[in-house]
């Protein structure tokens, strides 16, 4: 009824060309403030929804971490078996050495030529230096190293070190971010609901009741060092939230600032050319991936020394079995590590949403420390009747959200429209949020 009387009064004033009275502007401000109040409630509700999503993502991360730990244990067991078999084989490497050495001398030229062709075609830069480095590497390598797939073992060990490093970095980021988020989400603002469903005033003085914090909580004592009967300073209460969200996001993104980990594949394929080029430049081991393309190199792998030393054949079989198992679990670990990294990216994105959604409300509320519930104040209203420069059918309104900068809004409606002030308030909030994000 009150809204209807307001519209009737505005319509009569409008058609008569009268200026809108202060009382009518005040009533329009009240109507617009109701919309702003609703949007603030929605924003705070979305903040809590994002918080729930972050918690769900963290639970998924914990399950994934258990799978990672299990895969790591199996991978390490297989690596230990591989190293054990390798050491036992090294103790008897003199067997068949003459046969292997002869084949190795024929294998090296083919391997070098094949590798350099690949490098010139795919990797391109620094072929001369790489060629010299490869020559030294092949001359210093033994056919026995080749025979026991030493390159695969070395690659596996290097990958294991990188995996451990990446996991440590990500866990450190998660631990620091989780500590901050635990403090942020514990039974305070995020667990309380508005008690006044008719008019929610999160920016009023404390005598209305704290809607966010349990005053007895440690966090509440930290951010509310003043007596409850003193005026409510929104900035003092919400600034810790803002700071903590920002700190959590920084912690989560820390690992992304470091050198990214390229998840390798164990086979030589066109899809991992970058990894092969890196290995060739680093220590030439990438060239050994091309042994399948050289006949004499393949013959070394097929040398059978069982006649001279039967136990060596068994040891080699054990080595190959444990090596394949270690490679299998290393690939599984890489897959889980990628999923874990994706959880970090998802959490970081949610923290960004939380930051953006929370910031505009806290910035808006920080503009006032009074008990005035008029979040939106209407200062002037003009249409074609009062200002001929305004096109017919449009209404120009100047408002303020609290004591912010003046916001000019133009809506394709007459003042008498039932949802006029709701549309004005919506456009004003949109402008305010855009400007807040730009700052």
From Swiss-Prot:
UniProt keyword annotations, A-Z = Chaperone, Cytoplasm, Cytoplasmic vesicle, Disulfide bond, Endoplasmic reticulum, Glycoprotein, Membrane, Microsome, Mitochondrion, Nucleus, Phosphoprotein, Secreted, Signal, Ubl conjugation
Q: Give the free-text PTM comment from the record.
A: Proteolytically cleaved on its way through the secretory system, probably within the Golgi lumen. Proteolytic cleavage is not necessary for its chaperone activity. All non-secreted forms are not proteolytically cleaved. Chaperone activity of uncleaved forms is dependent on a non-reducing environment.
What molecular function does GO assign, one term? ubiquitin protein ligase binding
Query: Please, one GO biological process term?
Result: response to misfolded protein
Membrane topology field: Peripheral membrane protein
Query: Which residues does the annotation flag as glycosylated?
Result: 80, 97, 139, 283, 320, 346, 366
Specify the domain of life of the species encoding this protein: Eukaryota
> Where on the chain is Phosphoserine found, per UniProt?
127
Tissue expression from the record: Expressed abundantly in liver, testis, and brain.
| Compartments in which it is found | Secreted; Nucleus; Cytoplasm; Mitochondrion membrane
Region forming the signal peptide: 1-19
Gene Ontology CC annotation, any one: mitochondrial inner membrane
Q: Where in the chain are disulfide-linked cysteines found?
A: 96-305, 107-297, 110-294, 115-287, 123-277
- Motif Nuclear localization signal covers 72-75, 433-437
Which family is this sequence assigned to?
Answer: Belongs to the clusterin family.
Q: State its role.
A: Functions as extracellular chaperone that prevents aggregation of non native proteins. Prevents stress-induced aggregation of blood plasma proteins. Inhibits formation of amyloid fibrils by APP, APOC2, B2M, CALCA, CSN3, SNCA and aggregation-prone LYZ variants (in vitro). Does not require ATP. Maintains partially unfolded proteins in a state appropriate for subsequent refolding by other chaperones, such as HSPA8/HSC70. Does not refold proteins by itself.
| Subunit-structure text | Antiparallel disulfide-linked heterodimer of an alpha chain and a beta chain. Self-associates and forms higher oligomers. Interacts with a broad range of misfolded proteins, including APP, APOC2 and LYZ. Slightly acidic pH promotes interaction with misfolded proteins. Forms high-molecular weight oligomers upon interaction with misfolded proteins. Interacts with APOA1, LRP2, CLUAP1 and PON1. Interacts with the complement membrane attack complex. Interacts (via alpha chain) with XRCC6.
In Swiss-Prot or TrEMBL terms, this protein is called Clusterin
Highest lineage ranks of the organism?
Answer: Eukaryota, Metazoa, Chordata, Craniata, Vertebrata
The gene that this protein is the product of is CLU
